C-alpha cells in the first residue's frame, strides 16, 4: 500500500498515476534543487554582508524612526534582488496595493503607462481605470495619466515592433512576468531583457517596471539583473516564504524607490518613517526561507503538470519545461471538473479542510470565481491554492505549496476529485 493511502483514500488507478509521475519528475526536481541551493547561498551571503543581529528583529512603534531592523531588511532585499535599494514594508496590503503605490509614485499627469505585455491582471485594471467602474475613485486615469498597451501576439509572445513604436511616448514600460488569467507561460529573464532593450532603444529615458509576483527565486537571477529599473512583489507570495503575514516590496534604482516611498508615506518623509511593530522576525525569516519554499512550490507544479498530462490535460507550462513562476494553468473543460479540482485541494489543506469552495463574485473580477485556499495566511498564494473563473474553457490556476509531501497529497486528491469520481 502507498504511504499516501495511510492518510487519504486514493483509488488504485490514481496511485498508479502518482507512481509514474514521480518517476518522470525526478530530473526536473533535481534541477530546481540546484536553483534553490544557489539562491539560498546568495541569501545567506546577503544576511552576512548586512551584519543583521537578533536585536534587528525587535520592531518599532510610532513613527518608526531609526529602525535599524527595517533598514537592514531592505538592504538584504536590495542585494538579493540585484537592486540599488528596496522598500520592504508591512504597510503594503497586497501585490495590487504595492503595484499601485509604485505606479502612482512614478507617474504624473500627462505621463503614459505602456503595458508591454498586454492587458494587465484583472485587479490592476481597476487601479489604472480600465474596468469602467472606478471613475472618480482616484485611478491613474482620474489623475490624468494615460494608458497604452502593446498586446501580445497570437502565440503569446511580445510584439517587439509595436513596443518600439509605442515606447517613445511612454514614461513607464510595464512588464507582467506571470500570466494573470491568460494561458501562457511566465516570461523568462531573456524575454524581459529583450523587452527592456527594445523599449530603451526607442526611448532611453523610459522606466522599465516589472510586476515580479510569483516569479521570485524561480531562477538564479531577478529582473533587475535583466534590464528592469524597478521590480514589485508581494510578501504573501514567493519572497515571504509562507511566514511573512503581510507586506510587499519594491526594489530597483535608488531614485525610483525613493519616489515610491514618498507615495507610500508622504512627500518629504520617504523611507525614514514606518514602524514595524512585531513583523520584522517573520519578514526576515520568511525571506530567508523563501528559496527553499519556492523550490517546494515548483516541485509541486512540476508534479501537478506531469499528473495532469497523464490524465490527458495540457498544462502550461509542461513539467519538462523551464519554470519562471510558480503557477500552473490548465483547462478543466467543465465547470464540474474545475469545482471538483478546487474542492480536492481544499480537502487536503491544513486549514479549513472541511470547507467546500463555491463559485462567487469577487472584487476586481468580471466573472464568478472559485477559489481554494486552506492557508495559514489569508490570500497567500505561496501556500497551495487554486482558483479559476467560471467561464469556458474553465481554466484552473494552481500555485504554491509550502512543502512537497503535503502538496503532492493535495494535488493527487484534486485530480481524483475532478477526473476519477466514478
Question: What spans do the regions from the language model cover?
Answer:
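Phosphate-/polyanion-interacting regions in eukaryotic proteins
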Residues: 2-9, 100, 107, 112, ...
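N-terminal small-domain helix-loop-helix segment of the aminotransferase-like
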Residues: 63-69
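Conserved PLP-enzyme active-site core in the AAT-like
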Residues: 4-26, 33, 42-49, 53-56, ...
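Conserved C-terminal alpha-helix-loop-beta "cap" of PLP-dependent enzymes
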Residues: 309-421
Amino acid at each position: 500500500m502507498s504511504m499516501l493511502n495511510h492518510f487519504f483514500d486514493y483509488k488504485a488507478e490514481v496511485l498508479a498515476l502518482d507512481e509514474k509521475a514521480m518517476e518522470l519528475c525526478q530530473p526536473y526536481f533535481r534541477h530546481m534543487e540546484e536553483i534553490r541551493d544557489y539562491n539560498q547561498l546568495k541569501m545567506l551571503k546577503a544576511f552576512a554582508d548586512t551584519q543583521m543581529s537578533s536585536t534587528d528583529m525587535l520592531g518599532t512603534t510610532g513613527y518608526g524612526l531609526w529602525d535599524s531592523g527595517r533598514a537592514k531588511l531592505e538592504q538584504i532585499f536590495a542585494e538579493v534582488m540585484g537592486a540599488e535599494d528596496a522598500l520592504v514594508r508591512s504597510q503594503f496590503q497586497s501585490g495590487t496595493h504595492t503595484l499601485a503605490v509604485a505606479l502612482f509614485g512614478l507617474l504624473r499627469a500627462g505621463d503614459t503607462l505602456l503595458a508591454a505585455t498586454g492587458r494587465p491582471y484583472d485587479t490592476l485594471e481597476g487601479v489604472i481605470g480600465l474596468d469602467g467602474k472606478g471613475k472618480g475613485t482616484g485611478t491613474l486615469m482620474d489623475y490624468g495619466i494615460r494608458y497604452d498597451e502593446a498586446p501580445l501576439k497570437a502565440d503569446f509572445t511580445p510584439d517587439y515592433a509595436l513596443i518600439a513604436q509605442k515606447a517613445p511616448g511612454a514614461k513607464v514600460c510595464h512588464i507582467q512576468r506571470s500570466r494573470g488569467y491568460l494561458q501562457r507561460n511566465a516570461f523568462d529573464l531573456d524575454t524581459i531583457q529583450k523587452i527592456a532593450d527594445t523599449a530603451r532603444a526607442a526611448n532611453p529615458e523610459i522606466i522599465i517596471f516589472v510586476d515580479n509576483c510569483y516569479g521570485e527565486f524561480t531562477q538564479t537571477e531577478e529582473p533587475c539583473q535583466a534590464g528592469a529599473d524597478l521590480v514589485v512583489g508581494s510578501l504573501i507570495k514567493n519572497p515571504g516564504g509562507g511566514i511573512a503575514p503581510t507586506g510587499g516590496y519594491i526594489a530597483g534604482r535608488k531614485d525610483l524607490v525613493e519616489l515610491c516611498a514618498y507615495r507610500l508615506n508622504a512627500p518629504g518623509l520617504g523611507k525614514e518613517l514606518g514602524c514595524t511593530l512585531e513583523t520584522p522576525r517573520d519578514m526576515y525569516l520568511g525571506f530567508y526561507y523563501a528559496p527553499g519554499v519556492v523550490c517546494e512550490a515548483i516541485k509541486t507544479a512540476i508534479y501537478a503538470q506531469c499528473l495532469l498530462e497523464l490524465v490527458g490535460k495540457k498544462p502550461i507550462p509542461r513539467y519538462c519545461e523551464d519554470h519562471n513562476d510558480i503557477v500552473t494553468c490548465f483547462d478543466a473543460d467543465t465547470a464540474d471538473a474545475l469545482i471538483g479540482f478546487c474542492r480536492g485541494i481544499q480537502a487536503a489543506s491544513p486549514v479549513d479542510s472541511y470547507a467546500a469552495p463555491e463559485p462567487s463574485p469577487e472584487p476586481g473580477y468580471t466573472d464568478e470565481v472559485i477559489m481554494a485556499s486552506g492557508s495559514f495566511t489569508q490570500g497567500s498564494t505561496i501556500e497551495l491554492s487554486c482558483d479559476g473563473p467560471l467561464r469556458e474553457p474553465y481554466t484552473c490556476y494552481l500555485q504554491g505549496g509550502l512543502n512537497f509531501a503535503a502538496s503532492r497529497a493535495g494535488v493527487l486528491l484534486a485530480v481524483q476529485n475532478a477526473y476519477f469520481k466514478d
